Structure formats: C-alpha cells, structure tokens
Amino acid sequence: LEKCGYEIKETAIRKGLRETAWNGRLQILEEHPLFIVDGAHNEDAAAKLADSIEFYFTNKRIIYIMGMLKDKEVDRVIALTEKYADQILTVTPPDNPRAMHAYDLATEVAKVHPNVTAVDSLEEAVELSHLLAGRDDVILCFGSLSYLGRILKLMEKRKTAGNKRKAKR
C-alpha cells in the first residue's frame, strides 16, 4: 500500500495483525473441551498444523475428526498428523463427489494409528468426540475445507441447545 502512496504507521500494521482472525485456521469453537477447526488439507497445511499442535497442545489428549478429499495428499497429511492423536474419527465430507469415504480413510489411518473409527455422519462425529473427550481435552477437526462450514453450523446448534437447557434450570 505504501507503494501506492498510502502512509501506514507501524503501530497500525501491528494492531491489524494482532486483531486479525483467520476463520478455519485453528479456529476455536468451544472451550471445554477445546473444539478447534482447521482447514489443513494438504502436506504444507498439515505440517503447519503439526507445528501448532506441538506448540500449543503438548501433553494434551487430542481427538481428531478427520475428513479428506480423494485427490488430496492423504498419505502425507496422515503421516504428519497421526502421532499427536489419541483417537481419530474419520468422516466422509458431505456433498462432494471428490470426498474420500470415511471407511477408506480409516483403512489408511489404521496402517499407522491403532485408534481409528469411521463414523457415518458429521453429527455423529461431533457427538462421539464429545463423549470421548474430557473437559481438558482437545477435539481437532480438519482435513478438508469442504465440510468445515457444516461443522461450524453443528457446533452453533449445540451451543444454542446447551443455552436453552441452561435457561430451563
């Protein structure tokens, strides 16, 4: 922008960076358990996700909800991320002809990780992950941008339902 004649103070740049949120990149949807969505769907993004897991979640129990598209770097994403998970739930990204079926993804994950379960729907994955997770655990949903919007809606629905239950007390 400076090349175009705009004068921007360094403090404004720093403030902008500090206050910028990147939806779908380590986006926290719930705090107890910590429920995070991340758009990691290829080798580069999976490497960045692995770095973030190491930095932020060392010594945390982590449950993945993982869904991939067939034409992505499935083997590399699995190789870079599987070692951080205690449990991996695989899902089929809905409404996408390129979606890898949850059972096929589970078969690939099972080659390197012993605790993998294919789940029939995103709703079931969200519910099961919450049943498996303790208050201080991490649920991390990633693998394809194509279903993160659906996860956001499901989590909003859970939050609304939870608020209604609290209001009735």
Feature roles, as predicted:
Residues Y147-G149:
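Short, active-site-adjacent cap segments at secondary-structure transitions
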Residues S144:
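Active-site-proximal loop/hinge segments that shape catalytic or ion-binding/gating pockets
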Residues L1-Q87:
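Nucleotide phosphate-binding/pyrophosphate-handling subdomain across enzymes
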Residues L1-C4, I53, V109, A133, ...:
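Active-site catalytic pocket residues across diverse enzymes, especially alpha/beta-hydrolases
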Residues E2, L34-F35, I78-V138:
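C-terminal helical cap/extension that packs against the catalytic core
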Residues P93-N96, G162-R169:
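Short, flexible loop segments at boundaries between secondary-structure elements
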